[in-house]
Amino acid sequence: MKKVAVYPGTFDPITFGHIDVINKALKLFDKVIIAASDGANKNYLFNSLERVQLIKKALFVDLKFDKKKIEVISFTSLTTDLCKKYKSNIILRGLRAVSDFEYEFQLAGMNRKLNNNIETIFLMSDVENQIISSRFVKEIVRLKGDIKKFTTKSTIKSLKEKYE
């Protein structure tokens, strides 16, 4: 049986931090479902369709990832329901710093209460990616700064178009 992990997030936009976590996950799982959340309580720069396209371009065009091992979707449901749909009991989350852990710990606990078969696996970003956040990347590009150390070429192009 294939081991499938669900990696939910906003990915607004995808960064090298996210990609670092995806790389690590691909070493542990047969397939990774990258699920761009479309939660109502967030203000997104890119809508869910745009974020799915950005992720696909970053992974499959810029970085040449194996399409057979990754599926990119958007979702509006509970993450636990998404896991059920994809026959996965693994939620994958990336951690950058200790400050991320408290929120992620609570989220993992809630998901476990919703479905006691769910395990949340935390993967640490490499040191050079721990400072990267989508929020900072958007702010840097808005102020006309250089973000090539933080995300892929296609994502940079899309970000610049949004801020023109």
From Swiss-Prot:
Q: Which CDD domains match?
A: PPAT
Site (Transition state stabilizer): residue numbering on this chain: H18
Give the chief site where it resides.
Answer: cytoplasm
Entries under NCBIfam families matching the protein: coaD_prev_kdtB, cyt_tran_rel
SUPFAM superfamilies reported in the protein's UniProt record? Nucleotidylyl transferase
Is Glycosyltransferase a UniProt keyword of this protein? no
Q: In which pathway does it act?
A: Cofactor biosynthesis; coenzyme A biosynthesis; CoA from (R)-pantothenate: step 4/5
| InterPro entries, per database record | Cyt_trans-like, PPAT, Rossmann-like_a/b/a_fold
Q: Which cofactor does it need?
A: Mg(2+)
Tell me where in or outside the cell this protein is found.
Cytoplasm
Ranked from the top, the taxonomy reads:
Bacteria, Pseudomonadati, Pseudomonadota, Alphaproteobacteria, Candidatus Pelagibacterales
Protein residues bound to ATP: T10, F11, H18, G94, L95, R96, E104, N129, Q130, I131, I132, S133, S134, R135
Function, in words: Reversibly transfers an adenylyl group from ATP to 4'-phosphopantetheine, yielding dephospho-CoA (dPCoA) and pyrophosphate.
Q: Name one Pfam family in it.
A: CTP_transf_like
Return the protein name.
Phosphopantetheine adenylyltransferase
UniProt keyword annotation of Transferase present: yes
Organism (species): Pelagibacter ubique (strain HTCC1062)
Family matches, as HAMAP family: PPAT_bact
Per the record, the GO terms for biological process are:
coenzyme A biosynthetic process
What the record says about family reads: Belongs to the bacterial CoaD family.
**Which catalytic reaction applies to this protein?**
(R)-4'-phosphopantetheine + ATP + H(+) = 3'-dephospho-CoA + diphosphate
Recorded GO CC terms: cytoplasm
Ordered alphabetically, the record's keywords are: ATP-binding, Coenzyme A biosynthesis, Cytoplasm, Magnesium, Nucleotide-binding, Nucleotidyltransferase, Transferase
